[in-house]
C-alpha cells in the first residue's frame, strides 16, 4: 500500500460464532501490522482495529445493526499515519482509528477472514478498491 493512497474492502456481514471476522489487513512485518474489520465477539458484531507493533491492542465498538448488510472498511495512508474508517451500505464513513506509521515503511494490504474457533466460515467479498488518500486524517 503506497503512501498517499487508500484501500477499501466491502463484504456482507454474516457472522454468528465467537471470533468470526473479516476486513482489511495491513502488514509491515510479522510483528507489525494492522487488522481492521468486524469481529463477532461477546455475542455481537464488533467494529474494531487491532494494532500490533511488537505488542497488540484492540479497540472495538458493537455494531449489531450491521448484521446482514454490506460493510466497507477503508484504510487511508497519508504522511505518517493510517486513518481507518468504516461504513455500512451507503451511509457516510465513520472515523474509527488513527494509527501512526512511518512513511518510509513498505506496507502490504489485503482482505482477510478468520474463524479461529470453527471451520467453514464463508465471507462474501464484493469489492477491493484503491483510490487517492483522504484529504483529512480524521
Task: Give residue spans per PLM region.
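Secretory/extracellular carbohydrate-interaction modules
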Residues: 1-47
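Localized edge beta-strand/strand-to-loop motifs within extracellular or lumenal beta-rich domains
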Residues: 69-83, 88-90
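Residue-level recognition of well-ordered beta-strand positions that form the cores
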Residues: 10-12, 25, 74-76, 85, ...
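Short, aromatic/His-centered strand-loop micro-motif at the edge of beta-sheets
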Residues: 51-74
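Surface-exposed loop/edge segments in extracytoplasmic proteins
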Residues: 32-34, 57-59, 91-97
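Ligand-recognition surfaces built from glycine- and aromatic
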Residues: 101-138
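Short, solvent-exposed beta-strand-to-loop segments that form ligand-recognition rims
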Residues: 87-108
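Extracellular/lumenal carbohydrate-interaction signature centered on repeated Trp-anchored short motifs
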Residues: 1-7, 62-69, 103
Amino acid at each position: 500500500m503506497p503512501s498517499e493512497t487508500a484501500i477499501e474492502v466491502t463484504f456482507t456481514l454474516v457472522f454468528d460464532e465467537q471470533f468470526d471476522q473479516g476486513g482489511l489487513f495491513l502488514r509491515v512485518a510479522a510483528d507489525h501490522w494492522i487488522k481492521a474489520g468486524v469481529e463477532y465477539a461477546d455475542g455481537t458484531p464488533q467494529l474494531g482495529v487491532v494494532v500490533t507493533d511488537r505488542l497488540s491492542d484492540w479497540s472495538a465498538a458493537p455494531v449489531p445493526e450491521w448484521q446482514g448488510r454490506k460493510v466497507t472498511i477503508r484504510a487511508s495512508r497519508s504522511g505518517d499515519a493510517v486513518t481507518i474508517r468504516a461504513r455500512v451500505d451507503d451511509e457516510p464513513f465513520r472515523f474509527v482509528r488513527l494509527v501512526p506509521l512511518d512513511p518510509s515503511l513498505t506496507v502490504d494490504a489485503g482482505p482477510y477472514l478468520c474463524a479461529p474457533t470453527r471451520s467453514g466460515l464463508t465471507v462474501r467479498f464484493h469489492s477491493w478498491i484503491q483510490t487517492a488518500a483522504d484529504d483529512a486524517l480524521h
